[in-house]
Amino acid sequence: MASEPYADRDDPRHFRRNGYLPIVSSSTYTTTSFTVSRSLRCFPSVLLVLVLAGCAGVKVTAVSNNDYLAQRRGDVLTTGNLSASAVAALQVVGSDEKRCLADLPACREALDSTTGLRDEQRLSTLAELWLKEAQDGGKVMAAEARTDAYLESARYAYAYLFLTTRTPSQRALEDRQTQVRDYYNFSVQQALVEVFDRYRGRPPSPEDTQGNFRLKTGRWTIGGRMTDVRLADDRLLPKELIPAASLSFGGLRNQYRRDGLGAELVAVTAKRVVSKGSDEIPWSETPFPAITAVARFPGETLEQVLSTYQVEVIGYDPYRQDSVDMAGVQAPLAANFTSGYGLWLARSGFARQSLLTLVGRGEVLERPHVYLLQPFDPDRRIVVMLHGLASSPEAWINVANEVLGDEELRRNYQIWQVYYPTNLPLAVNNQAIREAIEQTLANFDPQGTAKASHDMVLVGHSMGGVLSRLMLSSSGDQLWDAMLGSYGMQGARLEKARAKLG
Protein backbone atom coordinates (compact mmCIF):
# COMPACT_ATOMS: atom_id res chain seq x y z
CA MET A 1 0.00 0.00 0.00
CA ALA A 2 1.26 3.45 -0.86
CA SER A 3 2.10 5.59 2.03
CA GLU A 4 -0.31 8.30 2.86
CA PRO A 5 0.63 11.95 2.84
CA TYR A 6 2.01 13.18 6.14
CA ALA A 7 -0.72 15.78 6.20
CA ASP A 8 -3.30 12.99 6.34
CA ARG A 9 -1.50 11.54 9.33
CA ASP A 10 -2.37 14.66 11.26
CA ASP A 11 -5.99 13.61 10.97
CA PRO A 12 -7.04 11.74 14.16
CA ARG A 13 -9.08 9.34 12.05
CA HIS A 14 -5.82 8.12 10.54
CA PHE A 15 -4.43 7.21 13.93
CA ARG A 16 -7.55 5.34 14.94
CA ARG A 17 -7.51 3.35 11.68
CA ASN A 18 -3.84 2.35 11.95
CA GLY A 19 -3.57 1.73 15.67
CA TYR A 20 -1.81 4.93 16.69
CA LEU A 21 -2.82 7.18 19.55
CA PRO A 22 -1.97 10.84 19.31
CA ILE A 23 -0.54 12.90 22.10
CA VAL A 24 -2.42 16.15 22.07
CA SER A 25 -0.77 19.42 22.94
CA SER A 26 -2.45 22.71 23.62
CA SER A 27 -2.14 23.85 19.97
CA THR A 28 -1.72 20.93 17.69
CA TYR A 29 -1.35 17.17 17.48
CA THR A 30 2.22 15.98 17.90
CA THR A 31 3.92 13.26 15.99
CA THR A 32 4.84 11.35 19.20
CA SER A 33 3.10 7.97 19.22
CA PHE A 34 3.53 4.30 20.09
CA THR A 35 2.18 1.10 18.76
CA VAL A 36 -0.35 -0.82 20.96
CA SER A 37 -1.50 -3.56 18.63
CA ARG A 38 1.03 -6.05 20.08
CA SER A 39 0.21 -4.91 23.64
CA LEU A 40 -3.46 -5.53 23.06
CA ARG A 41 -2.72 -9.04 21.85
CA CYS A 42 -0.65 -9.73 25.05
CA PHE A 43 -3.21 -8.18 27.37
CA PRO A 44 -5.17 -11.43 28.09
CA SER A 45 -1.96 -13.21 29.17
CA VAL A 46 -0.93 -10.34 31.41
CA LEU A 47 -4.39 -10.23 32.95
CA LEU A 48 -4.27 -13.99 33.69
CA VAL A 49 -0.88 -13.61 35.42
CA LEU A 50 -2.24 -10.79 37.56
CA VAL A 51 -5.33 -12.81 38.54
CA LEU A 52 -3.25 -15.85 39.47
CA ALA A 53 -0.90 -13.69 41.50
CA GLY A 54 -3.92 -12.51 43.47
CA CYS A 55 -4.82 -16.08 44.68
CA ALA A 56 -3.56 -16.51 48.31
CA GLY A 57 -1.50 -19.58 49.21
CA VAL A 58 -3.30 -19.84 52.55
CA LYS A 59 -7.02 -20.31 52.92
CA VAL A 60 -8.95 -19.49 56.10
CA THR A 61 -11.61 -21.85 57.40
CA ALA A 62 -13.61 -21.76 60.61
CA VAL A 63 -12.69 -24.27 63.34
CA SER A 64 -15.18 -25.55 65.91
CA ASN A 65 -14.42 -25.27 69.62
CA ASN A 66 -13.92 -29.02 69.91
CA ASP A 67 -11.50 -29.12 66.99
CA TYR A 68 -9.64 -26.13 68.38
CA LEU A 69 -9.07 -27.86 71.72
CA ALA A 70 -8.12 -31.10 69.98
CA GLN A 71 -5.51 -29.29 67.88
CA ARG A 72 -4.13 -27.42 70.88
CA ARG A 73 -4.11 -30.27 73.42
CA GLY A 74 -4.26 -33.50 71.45
CA ASP A 75 -1.28 -35.81 71.93
CA VAL A 76 -0.31 -39.48 72.26
CA LEU A 77 -2.28 -39.84 75.50
CA THR A 78 -5.53 -38.27 74.31
CA THR A 79 -5.74 -38.96 70.56
CA GLY A 80 -2.99 -41.51 69.96
CA ASN A 81 -1.27 -39.11 67.55
CA LEU A 82 1.68 -36.81 68.11
CA SER A 83 0.93 -33.35 69.45
CA ALA A 84 1.14 -30.20 67.34
CA SER A 85 4.28 -29.24 69.29
CA ALA A 86 5.97 -32.53 68.42
CA VAL A 87 4.99 -32.26 64.74
CA ALA A 88 6.43 -28.72 64.61
CA ALA A 89 9.70 -29.98 66.11
CA LEU A 90 9.88 -32.78 63.52
CA GLN A 91 9.53 -30.25 60.70
CA VAL A 92 12.67 -28.50 61.94
CA VAL A 93 14.68 -31.68 61.31
CA GLY A 94 13.00 -32.22 57.93
CA SER A 95 10.64 -34.98 59.00
CA ASP A 96 6.97 -35.51 59.72
CA GLU A 97 4.90 -37.81 61.90
CA LYS A 98 4.58 -40.63 59.38
CA ARG A 99 8.27 -40.78 58.47
CA CYS A 100 9.35 -40.40 62.08
CA LEU A 101 7.17 -43.25 63.35
CA ALA A 102 8.41 -45.47 60.53
CA ASP A 103 11.96 -45.25 61.92
CA LEU A 104 11.82 -44.05 65.52
CA PRO A 105 15.51 -44.63 66.41
CA ALA A 106 16.70 -42.53 63.46
CA CYS A 107 14.08 -39.88 64.20
CA ARG A 108 15.13 -39.63 67.84
CA GLU A 109 18.79 -39.41 66.83
CA ALA A 110 18.00 -36.55 64.45
CA LEU A 111 16.15 -34.68 67.19
CA ASP A 112 18.92 -35.32 69.68
CA SER A 113 21.67 -34.01 67.41
CA THR A 114 20.00 -30.97 65.85
CA THR A 115 20.95 -27.47 66.95
CA GLY A 116 17.78 -25.96 65.53
CA LEU A 117 15.64 -26.82 68.57
CA ARG A 118 15.61 -25.42 72.07
CA ASP A 119 16.13 -27.91 74.91
CA GLU A 120 12.47 -27.69 75.89
CA GLN A 121 11.30 -28.56 72.37
CA ARG A 122 13.73 -31.44 71.98
CA LEU A 123 13.18 -32.99 75.43
CA SER A 124 9.38 -32.77 75.32
CA THR A 125 9.27 -34.30 71.83
CA LEU A 126 11.60 -37.14 72.80
CA ALA A 127 9.47 -37.85 75.89
CA GLU A 128 6.39 -38.07 73.67
CA LEU A 129 8.11 -40.30 71.09
CA TRP A 130 9.33 -42.78 73.74
CA LEU A 131 5.82 -42.90 75.20
CA LYS A 132 4.40 -43.49 71.72
CA GLU A 133 6.80 -46.40 71.22
CA ALA A 134 5.82 -47.98 74.55
CA GLN A 135 2.10 -47.64 73.86
CA ASP A 136 2.24 -48.87 70.27
CA GLY A 137 4.41 -51.83 71.27
CA GLY A 138 1.58 -53.35 73.30
CA LYS A 139 1.83 -57.08 73.82
CA VAL A 140 4.06 -57.47 70.75
CA MET A 141 6.92 -55.66 72.46
CA ALA A 142 8.93 -57.56 75.06
CA ALA A 143 7.94 -56.63 78.61
CA GLU A 144 11.38 -55.37 79.57
CA ALA A 145 11.72 -53.34 76.36
CA ARG A 146 8.33 -51.72 77.01
CA THR A 147 9.33 -50.87 80.59
CA ASP A 148 12.59 -49.41 79.25
CA ALA A 149 10.62 -47.19 76.87
CA TYR A 150 8.37 -45.93 79.67
CA LEU A 151 11.40 -45.11 81.82
CA GLU A 152 13.03 -43.28 78.89
CA SER A 153 9.86 -41.21 78.48
CA ALA A 154 9.82 -40.43 82.21
CA ARG A 155 13.51 -39.48 82.08
CA TYR A 156 13.09 -36.97 79.22
CA ALA A 157 9.95 -35.55 80.82
CA TYR A 158 11.83 -35.18 84.13
CA ALA A 159 14.64 -33.35 82.31
CA TYR A 160 12.15 -31.02 80.59
CA LEU A 161 10.38 -30.20 83.85
CA PHE A 162 13.36 -29.63 86.12
CA LEU A 163 16.60 -29.27 84.15
CA THR A 164 15.88 -26.67 81.47
CA THR A 165 16.49 -22.92 81.66
CA ARG A 166 12.96 -22.03 82.68
CA THR A 167 11.44 -23.32 85.92
CA PRO A 168 8.04 -25.04 86.08
CA SER A 169 6.53 -21.90 87.63
CA GLN A 170 7.63 -19.85 84.61
CA ARG A 171 5.76 -22.28 82.32
CA ALA A 172 2.77 -22.62 84.65
CA LEU A 173 0.16 -21.55 82.09
CA GLU A 174 1.58 -23.44 79.11
CA ASP A 175 -0.32 -26.40 77.68
CA ARG A 176 2.93 -28.14 76.75
CA GLN A 177 4.11 -28.36 80.36
CA THR A 178 0.79 -29.96 81.35
CA GLN A 179 1.23 -32.52 78.57
CA VAL A 180 4.79 -33.35 79.60
CA ARG A 181 3.78 -33.65 83.25
CA ASP A 182 1.17 -36.19 82.17
CA TYR A 183 3.83 -38.10 80.17
CA TYR A 184 5.94 -38.29 83.33
CA ASN A 185 3.08 -39.39 85.58
CA PHE A 186 1.75 -41.97 83.13
CA SER A 187 5.17 -43.39 82.28
CA VAL A 188 6.15 -43.78 85.95
CA GLN A 189 2.80 -45.41 86.65
CA GLN A 190 3.07 -47.91 83.81
CA ALA A 191 6.70 -48.77 84.50
CA LEU A 192 6.02 -49.51 88.19
CA VAL A 193 2.84 -51.47 87.53
CA GLU A 194 4.57 -53.62 84.90
CA VAL A 195 7.52 -54.31 87.19
CA PHE A 196 5.25 -55.32 90.07
CA ASP A 197 3.14 -57.45 87.73
CA ARG A 198 6.26 -59.42 86.92
CA TYR A 199 6.78 -59.95 90.65
CA ARG A 200 3.09 -60.57 91.40
CA GLY A 201 2.76 -62.44 94.68
CA ARG A 202 6.51 -62.33 95.24
CA PRO A 203 7.60 -58.67 95.39
CA PRO A 204 11.31 -57.85 95.33
CA SER A 205 12.92 -58.56 98.67
CA PRO A 206 13.78 -55.45 100.69
CA GLU A 207 17.48 -54.78 101.10
CA ASP A 208 17.04 -53.79 104.76
CA THR A 209 14.48 -53.20 107.49
CA GLN A 210 13.75 -49.73 106.11
CA GLY A 211 12.00 -51.13 103.04
CA ASN A 212 14.69 -50.13 100.54
CA PHE A 213 14.71 -52.33 97.44
CA ARG A 214 16.66 -52.71 94.22
CA LEU A 215 15.92 -54.65 91.06
CA LYS A 216 17.08 -54.90 87.46
CA THR A 217 14.84 -54.59 84.40
CA GLY A 218 16.32 -54.37 80.91
CA ARG A 219 18.96 -51.65 80.83
CA TRP A 220 17.63 -50.00 83.97
CA THR A 221 18.35 -50.50 87.65
CA ILE A 222 15.40 -49.46 89.81
CA GLY A 223 16.05 -48.62 93.43
CA GLY A 224 13.61 -47.17 95.89
CA ARG A 225 11.83 -47.18 99.20
CA MET A 226 8.37 -47.16 100.74
CA THR A 227 9.34 -45.91 104.19
CA ASP A 228 7.01 -42.91 103.94
CA VAL A 229 3.99 -45.21 103.54
CA ARG A 230 2.69 -47.42 106.35
CA LEU A 231 1.37 -50.70 104.94
CA ALA A 232 -0.94 -53.10 106.77
CA ASP A 233 0.55 -55.93 108.83
CA ASP A 234 3.89 -54.10 108.93
CA ARG A 235 4.65 -55.06 105.34
CA LEU A 236 7.58 -53.27 103.75
CA LEU A 237 6.35 -53.65 100.16
CA PRO A 238 2.91 -54.20 98.61
CA LYS A 239 1.92 -57.35 96.76
CA GLU A 240 0.45 -55.42 93.86
CA LEU A 241 0.10 -51.90 92.50
CA ILE A 242 -3.13 -50.78 90.82
CA PRO A 243 -3.31 -47.49 88.85
CA ALA A 244 -5.92 -45.25 90.47
CA ALA A 245 -6.91 -43.95 87.03
CA SER A 246 -8.02 -47.46 86.02
CA LEU A 247 -10.64 -47.62 88.80
CA SER A 248 -14.20 -46.39 88.42
CA PHE A 249 -16.76 -46.73 91.20
CA GLY A 250 -20.53 -46.94 90.95
CA GLY A 251 -22.35 -45.69 94.04
CA LEU A 252 -19.88 -42.91 94.83
CA ARG A 253 -21.12 -39.45 93.97
CA ASN A 254 -17.67 -37.95 93.50
CA GLN A 255 -14.08 -38.99 93.02
CA TYR A 256 -11.55 -36.70 94.67
CA ARG A 257 -7.97 -36.17 93.57
CA ARG A 258 -5.23 -33.55 93.60
CA ASP A 259 -3.31 -32.45 90.50
CA GLY A 260 0.44 -32.60 90.68
CA LEU A 261 3.47 -34.76 90.04
CA GLY A 262 3.61 -38.51 90.56
CA ALA A 263 1.84 -41.76 89.74
CA GLU A 264 -1.44 -42.20 91.63
CA LEU A 265 -1.60 -45.82 92.80
CA VAL A 266 -3.30 -48.19 95.22
CA ALA A 267 -0.91 -50.46 97.13
CA VAL A 268 -2.56 -53.86 97.62
CA THR A 269 -1.49 -55.95 100.63
CA ALA A 270 -4.45 -58.38 100.81
CA LYS A 271 -7.21 -59.61 98.52
CA ARG A 272 -10.12 -58.84 100.85
CA VAL A 273 -11.04 -56.67 103.83
CA VAL A 274 -12.89 -59.35 105.81
CA SER A 275 -11.09 -62.67 106.15
CA LYS A 276 -11.03 -65.64 108.51
CA GLY A 277 -8.47 -63.88 110.68
CA SER A 278 -10.57 -60.74 111.09
CA ASP A 279 -11.86 -61.85 114.50
CA GLU A 280 -8.45 -62.47 116.04
CA ILE A 281 -7.69 -58.81 116.81
CA PRO A 282 -10.25 -55.98 117.09
CA TRP A 283 -8.76 -53.72 114.41
CA SER A 284 -7.61 -53.82 110.79
CA GLU A 285 -5.54 -51.38 108.79
CA THR A 286 -6.69 -50.80 105.24
CA PRO A 287 -5.14 -53.31 102.82
CA PHE A 288 -5.64 -50.76 100.00
CA PRO A 289 -3.87 -47.52 100.96
CA ALA A 290 -3.60 -44.79 98.34
CA ILE A 291 0.00 -43.88 97.54
CA THR A 292 1.79 -41.59 95.12
CA ALA A 293 5.09 -42.66 93.56
CA VAL A 294 7.68 -40.37 92.01
CA ALA A 295 10.84 -41.25 90.08
CA ARG A 296 14.09 -39.34 90.41
CA PHE A 297 17.00 -39.69 88.00
CA PRO A 298 20.46 -39.13 89.52
CA GLY A 299 22.53 -36.26 88.19
CA GLU A 300 22.84 -32.52 88.66
CA THR A 301 23.12 -31.56 84.99
CA LEU A 302 21.09 -32.36 81.90
CA GLU A 303 23.94 -34.40 80.44
CA GLN A 304 24.28 -36.51 83.60
CA VAL A 305 20.56 -37.28 83.77
CA LEU A 306 20.36 -38.22 80.09
CA SER A 307 23.30 -40.60 80.35
CA THR A 308 22.18 -42.61 83.40
CA TYR A 309 20.23 -45.85 83.54
CA GLN A 310 19.49 -45.65 87.24
CA VAL A 311 16.22 -44.46 88.72
CA GLU A 312 15.07 -43.99 92.30
CA VAL A 313 11.38 -44.62 93.03
CA ILE A 314 9.85 -43.31 96.26
CA GLY A 315 6.34 -43.92 97.54
CA TYR A 316 4.54 -41.22 99.55
CA ASP A 317 1.38 -41.11 101.65
CA PRO A 318 -0.62 -38.31 99.94
CA TYR A 319 -2.64 -37.74 103.12
CA ARG A 320 0.49 -36.69 104.98
CA GLN A 321 2.44 -34.98 102.21
CA ASP A 322 1.25 -32.51 99.59
CA SER A 323 4.55 -31.57 97.92
CA VAL A 324 7.89 -33.14 97.06
CA ASP A 325 11.38 -31.85 96.27
CA MET A 326 12.45 -32.63 92.70
CA ALA A 327 15.92 -31.47 91.65
CA GLY A 328 15.67 -28.51 94.01
CA VAL A 329 12.17 -27.58 92.88
CA GLN A 330 9.22 -27.97 95.25
CA ALA A 331 6.48 -29.63 93.19
CA PRO A 332 2.88 -30.40 94.25
CA LEU A 333 2.33 -34.11 94.87
CA ALA A 334 -0.49 -35.73 92.89
CA ALA A 335 -3.05 -37.78 94.81
CA ASN A 336 -6.25 -39.78 94.42
CA PHE A 337 -8.19 -39.83 97.69
CA THR A 338 -11.15 -41.91 96.54
CA SER A 339 -9.35 -44.85 94.92
CA GLY A 340 -8.20 -46.68 98.06
CA TYR A 341 -11.51 -46.16 99.87
CA GLY A 342 -13.54 -47.25 96.85
CA LEU A 343 -11.51 -50.43 96.43
CA TRP A 344 -11.82 -51.09 100.19
CA LEU A 345 -15.61 -50.92 99.91
CA ALA A 346 -15.76 -53.00 96.73
CA ARG A 347 -13.78 -55.87 98.28
CA SER A 348 -15.19 -55.68 101.81
CA GLY A 349 -18.13 -58.10 101.65
CA PHE A 350 -19.83 -56.09 104.42
CA ALA A 351 -23.35 -56.16 102.95
CA ARG A 352 -23.58 -59.96 102.98
CA GLN A 353 -21.91 -60.27 106.37
CA SER A 354 -24.24 -57.75 108.06
CA LEU A 355 -27.37 -59.61 106.94
CA LEU A 356 -25.96 -62.99 108.01
CA THR A 357 -25.08 -61.58 111.42
CA LEU A 358 -28.59 -60.17 111.91
CA VAL A 359 -30.12 -63.65 111.59
CA GLY A 360 -27.38 -65.29 113.64
CA ARG A 361 -25.52 -66.86 110.70
CA GLY A 362 -22.42 -64.69 110.72
CA GLU A 363 -19.21 -66.67 110.92
CA VAL A 364 -16.38 -64.16 110.55
CA LEU A 365 -17.46 -60.95 112.29
CA GLU A 366 -19.22 -61.84 115.54
CA ARG A 367 -17.91 -58.93 117.60
CA PRO A 368 -17.13 -55.23 116.99
CA HIS A 369 -14.20 -54.53 114.70
CA VAL A 370 -12.41 -51.23 114.00
CA TYR A 371 -11.34 -50.47 110.41
CA LEU A 372 -8.78 -47.76 109.70
CA LEU A 373 -9.48 -46.17 106.31
CA GLN A 374 -5.98 -44.64 106.15
CA PRO A 375 -2.62 -45.50 107.65
CA PHE A 376 -2.59 -44.31 111.26
CA ASP A 377 -1.47 -40.70 111.67
CA PRO A 378 -0.68 -39.63 115.25
CA ASP A 379 -1.14 -35.96 114.35
CA ARG A 380 -4.75 -36.07 113.15
CA ARG A 381 -7.86 -36.45 115.28
CA ILE A 382 -10.03 -39.53 114.78
CA VAL A 383 -13.60 -39.61 113.49
CA VAL A 384 -15.36 -42.87 114.48
CA MET A 385 -18.41 -43.80 112.38
CA LEU A 386 -21.01 -46.24 113.75
CA HIS A 387 -23.59 -47.72 111.35
CA GLY A 388 -27.19 -48.60 112.17
CA LEU A 389 -29.39 -51.69 112.48
CA ALA A 390 -28.80 -54.47 109.92
CA SER A 391 -26.19 -52.26 108.29
CA SER A 392 -22.42 -52.03 107.92
CA PRO A 393 -19.71 -49.44 107.19
CA GLU A 394 -21.11 -49.30 103.66
CA ALA A 395 -23.81 -47.00 105.11
CA TRP A 396 -21.17 -44.25 105.19
CA ILE A 397 -20.10 -44.56 101.54
CA ASN A 398 -20.55 -40.95 100.48
CA VAL A 399 -20.17 -39.33 103.90
CA ALA A 400 -16.71 -40.84 104.38
CA ASN A 401 -15.76 -40.03 100.78
CA GLU A 402 -16.73 -36.38 101.24
CA VAL A 403 -14.58 -36.15 104.38
CA LEU A 404 -11.64 -37.69 102.52
CA GLY A 405 -12.20 -35.30 99.62
CA ASP A 406 -12.36 -32.08 101.66
CA GLU A 407 -8.88 -30.59 102.04
CA GLU A 408 -9.50 -28.97 105.43
CA LEU A 409 -11.11 -32.07 106.97
CA ARG A 410 -8.53 -34.37 105.38
CA ARG A 411 -5.70 -32.35 106.88
CA ASN A 412 -7.09 -32.54 110.42
CA TYR A 413 -9.01 -35.82 110.68
CA GLN A 414 -8.67 -39.53 109.93
CA ILE A 415 -11.59 -41.95 109.70
CA TRP A 416 -12.17 -45.13 111.67
CA GLN A 417 -15.26 -47.16 110.84
CA VAL A 418 -16.65 -49.72 113.29
CA TYR A 419 -18.47 -52.86 112.27
CA TYR A 420 -20.56 -54.47 115.01
CA PRO A 421 -23.22 -57.25 115.06
CA THR A 422 -26.57 -55.48 115.38
CA ASN A 423 -28.34 -58.54 116.82
CA LEU A 424 -26.62 -58.08 120.19
CA PRO A 425 -28.04 -55.96 123.06
CA LEU A 426 -27.03 -52.29 123.14
CA ALA A 427 -25.25 -52.65 126.47
CA VAL A 428 -23.13 -55.51 125.16
CA ASN A 429 -22.20 -53.67 121.97
CA ASN A 430 -21.48 -50.49 123.93
CA GLN A 431 -18.94 -52.25 126.12
CA ALA A 432 -17.42 -54.25 123.26
CA ILE A 433 -17.01 -51.21 120.99
CA ARG A 434 -15.36 -49.27 123.82
CA GLU A 435 -12.88 -52.07 124.36
CA ALA A 436 -12.15 -52.43 120.64
CA ILE A 437 -11.38 -48.72 120.26
CA GLU A 438 -9.23 -48.67 123.41
CA GLN A 439 -7.22 -51.68 122.22
CA THR A 440 -6.74 -50.09 118.80
CA LEU A 441 -5.45 -46.87 120.35
CA ALA A 442 -3.17 -48.82 122.68
CA ASN A 443 -1.64 -50.61 119.68
CA PHE A 444 -0.86 -47.49 117.65
CA ASP A 445 -0.18 -45.07 120.52
CA PRO A 446 0.86 -47.08 123.60
CA GLN A 447 1.79 -43.98 125.60
CA GLY A 448 -1.48 -42.23 124.78
CA THR A 449 0.31 -38.95 124.10
CA ALA A 450 -0.52 -38.47 120.41
CA LYS A 451 -3.08 -35.93 119.26
CA ALA A 452 -5.06 -38.79 117.71
CA SER A 453 -5.68 -40.34 121.14
CA HIS A 454 -7.61 -37.31 122.40
CA ASP A 455 -10.84 -35.48 121.50
CA MET A 456 -12.22 -38.28 119.34
CA VAL A 457 -15.36 -37.50 117.31
CA LEU A 458 -18.22 -40.05 117.23
CA VAL A 459 -20.75 -40.06 114.39
CA GLY A 460 -23.64 -42.53 114.55
CA HIS A 461 -26.68 -43.42 112.48
CA SER A 462 -29.82 -45.13 113.82
CA MET A 463 -28.66 -47.71 116.37
CA GLY A 464 -25.16 -46.32 115.92
CA GLY A 465 -26.41 -42.93 117.11
CA VAL A 466 -27.75 -44.49 120.33
CA LEU A 467 -24.45 -46.29 120.88
CA SER A 468 -22.51 -43.06 120.28
CA ARG A 469 -24.57 -41.37 123.00
CA LEU A 470 -24.01 -44.25 125.39
CA MET A 471 -20.27 -44.20 124.76
CA LEU A 472 -20.11 -40.51 125.68
CA SER A 473 -22.20 -40.98 128.83
CA SER A 474 -21.39 -42.49 132.21
CA SER A 475 -23.82 -43.27 135.01
CA GLY A 476 -21.06 -43.81 137.50
CA ASP A 477 -22.20 -46.24 140.21
CA GLN A 478 -25.89 -45.39 139.93
CA LEU A 479 -26.92 -48.54 138.05
CA TRP A 480 -24.69 -50.73 140.21
CA ASP A 481 -26.09 -49.29 143.41
CA ALA A 482 -29.65 -49.67 142.11
CA MET A 483 -29.03 -53.35 141.31
CA LEU A 484 -27.57 -54.00 144.76
CA GLY A 485 -30.56 -52.31 146.36
CA SER A 486 -33.03 -54.33 144.30
CA TYR A 487 -31.45 -57.77 144.63
CA GLY A 488 -29.59 -57.46 147.93
CA MET A 489 -26.66 -59.53 146.71
CA GLN A 490 -23.91 -60.34 149.16
CA GLY A 491 -20.89 -62.56 149.58
CA ALA A 492 -20.03 -65.02 146.83
CA ARG A 493 -23.07 -64.06 144.80
CA LEU A 494 -21.99 -60.42 144.80
CA GLU A 495 -18.44 -61.28 143.77
CA LYS A 496 -19.71 -63.47 140.95
CA ALA A 497 -21.91 -60.65 139.63
CA ARG A 498 -19.07 -58.15 139.94
CA ALA A 499 -16.72 -60.41 137.96
CA LYS A 500 -19.29 -61.02 135.25
CA LEU A 501 -20.50 -57.44 134.78
CA GLY A 502 -17.20 -55.74 135.41
Where are these regions (language model features)?
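Bacterial N-terminal signal peptides
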Residues: P44-A53
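Bacterial Sec signal peptide processing site at the extreme N-terminus
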Residues: A53-R73
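Amphipathic alpha-helical repeat scaffolds of TPR domains
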Residues: G74-Q91, E120-E133
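Helix-turn-helix repeat elements of alpha-solenoid scaffolds
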Residues: D96-C107
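Serine-dependent carboxylesterase/thioesterase catalytic core
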Residues: D112, L131-S205, V383-L389, V418-N423, ...
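Non-catalytic protein-protein interaction scaffold segments in large eukaryotic complex-forming proteins
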Residues: W130-E133, A154-Y158, F162-G277
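Non-catalytic propeptide/linker segments at domain boundaries
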Residues: P282-P378
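Short, surface-exposed "cap/lid" segments of acyl-processing enzymes
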Residues: P368-E408
